[in-house]
């Protein structure tokens, strides 16, 4: 899961080298919380620093590329989310949506693909949900209710074109028709602070 790349990933590739094997690709997971505090049925984790989390993905890339025969092998993040627990109210919040927006803006830098865990809150390992919002993994709550993070993905889906701006708070692209589209986020907890952004965009 990317927890101990230096041991498991490097050892795996050393084994492949010794046995004359070549993997088609490398897979890993990506979750971005500290161990949660439990309160009854729920877990309340603290979000990890996003840059620190992204650095772990780059570490996987660097380990793979340190082997000449495996350099450039695609890495697929087969699960990612903030929390790995299906009873985390964070999943149902605007904060989750904003944090995931930042992750989406960067996950493609060193990964071939990345798959959000998961689409719906009906999670087979936990059975049928007992309420529409119970902290499940999904983008969509029980009864087909889109959660805030669903809209993050919907907005990013519309970002097709050439990226002309990317920062810690926003991404802007210019489409073939010359129009600009962007997504901005503000992962502030509680009352939070207002966010003011200024963009300098090319017109040519």
Which residues make up each language-model segment?
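Structural beta-sheet core signal
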Residues: 77, 116, 182-184
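Alpha-helix capping/termination and helix-coil
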Residues: 64, 68, 111, 157-164, ...
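Catalytic cores of secreted or luminal carbohydrate-active enzymes
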Residues: 104, 118, 130-166
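Noncatalytic carbohydrate-binding groove/subsite architecture in carbohydrate-active enzymes
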Residues: 1-112
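A Trp-anchored, charged/polar loop motif used as the substrate-binding/catalytic surface
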Residues: 54-55, 163-169
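Substrate-binding clefts and catalytic carboxylate motifs of secreted carbohydrate-active enzymes
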Residues: 87-92, 97-100, 104-125, 163, ...
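Carbohydrate-binding surface patches
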Residues: 169-204
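Glycine-rich beta-alpha junction loops
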Residues: 30-32, 81-82, 118-123, 188
